[in-house]
Amino acid sequence: MALSMAALASNLGSASPIVQRAEPLVLWYRAPASDWNEALPIGNGRLGAMVFGRVGEERIQLNEHSLWDGHRQDTTNPQALAHLAEVRRLIFEGRNGEATALADRYLLGNPRGVKSYQSLGDLWISTGHDQQAVEDYRRELDLDGAIVRTSYRLGGARFTREAFASAPDGVIVLRFACNLRGKVNLRIRITRAQDATSFTEGNNRLILRGQVDDRPPGVQRSLGMRFECHVLAIPSGGSVEAKGDTLEVQNANSALLIIAAATDYRKENPELLCRRATDAAERKDYFRMKDVHQADFRRLFRRVSLSITNPIPLEQRTLTPTDRRLEAVRNGANDPGLAVLYFQFGRYLLISSSRPGGLPANLQGLWNEHMHAPWNSDYHTNINLQMNYWPAEVTNLAECHLPLFDYMEGLVSSGERTAKVHYGCRGWVVHHLSDVWGFTTPADGVWGIWPMGAAWLCQHIWEHYAFSGDKRFLQRTYPMMKGAALFLLDFLIPEPKHGWLVTNPSHSPENSFRMPNGQVSQLTYGATMDLEIIHDLFTHCIQAEDVLGVDREFQKRLRDALGKLAPLQISPKTGRLQEWIEDYEEPEPGHRHMSHLFALHPGNEITLRGTPQLAAAARKSLEYRLAHGGGHTGWSRAWIISFWARLEDGEQAWQNLQALLARSTLPNL
């Protein structure tokens, strides 16, 4: 969960620590990865790989950022608008069960969900070496150098490997070497679980070619994405030849593997793209390519350093493998250097998974070994996509933020149609998840009827402007902010008790509540998070309009709506900030989402000094969640750290960071 460590940036990055000798920014281990969750990631924003470091047969699991199942289509439901008013009426009348049944039948998109981001395939490289016979084994990820290394001794020879993903050259590069001449022997093949074939071309090119098998009902041919991967084997000394679907390198001093991959997502020819990339890289010196790659990466990575006083001597930390350090923290050790490594690993992952011109980091960043990934490895816009980018500005990686804005622009057209067809509203809308095909309709179930995704995403526009002061950027992206606000102005409706403006239907992401009659429901009106996101968006729109000197009449409408918006509620029974406009009981008091605290972080409507009563109520809500087991997922615990940072409770922030490391962090961090 290091990708979501903006919490550390909020809490630790602003401190003034006692500077010691530099923390070694290396993850390292004494054994190969036993499974995917122990492999080490590399990426250039578009291509990613998980390197296992296996001795006898290395596995390199590959990804290309645009390789998804599915195809672009209109997923709106033409029946939705006709039933919206009835759903709203039933919710206002407290007949939530009837409203839920009607909403589930008519308000969801068609189809109801997205398909999965997919693995490109696996590269297998056999060495013939016996794992049991090797000595002095080490594998490592050098964060500052953005390179994975594997080394070991066998029979008097030292074998070394290096792997990196170059953004300047657009390829993944692997090098196998030995200190004794003629000792590098490799058998190289590439596989994919479905929808592809592999073959060789010439003596040294291995090709994986395929098309995702996506056949809607009644359609005979696949509409799925075409993709290709080329592996070029270049030995130094020795020879290389093709045998069936395998390349064999024999008696080489070293061997270079250049990997390129592409899809037709942007209507380009993936074969041509792969040939261009491999042919260009083939003409370059390996060490020059590595130097250019590292200079490009360090231009971003070295902008931020972090040092925390550590009771463990530097030499001891350097000589202890990362998994052992993590195990020690689980057993109660205090190792602030591991927090530094974790923080910088988060920055490494964002640089590796999100570069200008590419797609944004998805639910798993860039790395996924499945054909059908958990939660489709999609773009969850009810926190996860946003959380990926919380570190972007505060850790000085503004360029890595840009793919998110490009992606948002690609959603606007679909979001406008969804707003019109489903709600009869102007502007644009996104619900709780999306994909690379522009999916914006409600998905999965009634919990997907959460039309706040576009509004929350727009917070990132203002964040980027606030850090950069780039007025041209704001001019380009302000229409997205205005469009999201226009949708909400049309969508808001007066509730019957006080005449406050509220959202309806409304949902607090993935959570439910118990009504006075004992019925458990998810749909309501005016969920607290909705109100907080609206306040955030409208406020930022007003500020943007002041900066740009535009839309004074629209600004007045926003101010009027803010004045009528339902206020945040503090429970008279518990003193906690209510998650819903009514003081409902929570069936799952330790729920992983803490959506009603959005105004504390990443929003800033609630502050210790500006709104002390709301801040105290938010603290009680946070304490209540934690007392009932909240924070049991890694991303949730990272959010909790951010809450404590905003509440200026450094001790609690630190304790929750230790809990994140101890309970929710895998050996590869």
Description of each model-found segment:
Residues 3-21:
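Bacterial Sec-dependent signal peptides at the C-terminal "C-region" and cleavage site
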Residues 16-446, 461-465, 482, 496, ...:
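Aromatic-residue-lined binding/catalytic grooves and analogous aromatic/hydrophobic interfacial grooves
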Residues 343, 381-385, 451-458, 478, ...:
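Short alpha-helical patches at coil-to-helix transitions and adjacent helical residues
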Residues 346, 457, 481, 534, ...:
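Hydrophobic, well-ordered secondary-structure elements that form the walls
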